Amino acid sequence: MALNQLSLSLQFARDAEATAHRATLPRHAVARWIRHALAVDAEITVRIVGAEEGQRLNREFRHKDYATNVLTFDYQQEPVAVADLVLCAPVVEREAREQNKTLEEHYAHLLVHGTLHAQGWDHETSEQDAQEMEAYETAILQELGFADPYAA
């Protein structure tokens, strides 16, 4: 299977919570996970942040006053997808622990999830859209050697 081209910028905020995850997110792995979710070529910035920045961005752009796991800012979907994916390290770590997953597994899932959002996928419009997106995420992650992220 030929994968689409990816121009990737990987950033870690100057925050102890974010930089602690640097070893879990080698550039080659992040690029591989994202490329498997791409239907078009892409220019994507991935930024790993701490709780404070995550909460501020979620409040500012989604009007929700808490840090969330991943925020996708999609600027263009065609002919090249252009987006920023912001992942909040302490939220990802807490969720991974609660779901009995490794950090790597959860980051892979959230990066695939965010990449699909960057290409127009949406799980909040209808139950059918949510099911289709979850099924596609699961297929991509299984291709990458990860378990179904939605399995109980």
UniProtKB/Swiss-Prot annotation:
GO terms for biological process: rRNA processing. One of its GO terms (cellular component) is cytoplasm. One of its GO terms (molecular function) is zinc ion binding. Pfam families: YbeY (PF02130). It is found in: Cytoplasm. Its cofactor is Zn(2+). Keywords: Cytoplasm, Endonuclease, Hydrolase, Metal-binding, Nuclease, Ribosome biogenesis, rRNA processing, Zinc. Zn(2+) binds at H113, H117, H123. Belongs to the endoribonuclease YbeY family. Single strand-specific metallo-endoribonuclease involved in late-stage 70S ribosome quality control and in maturation of the 3' terminus of the 16S rRNA. This is Endoribonuclease YbeY. It comes from Acidovorax sp. (strain JS42).
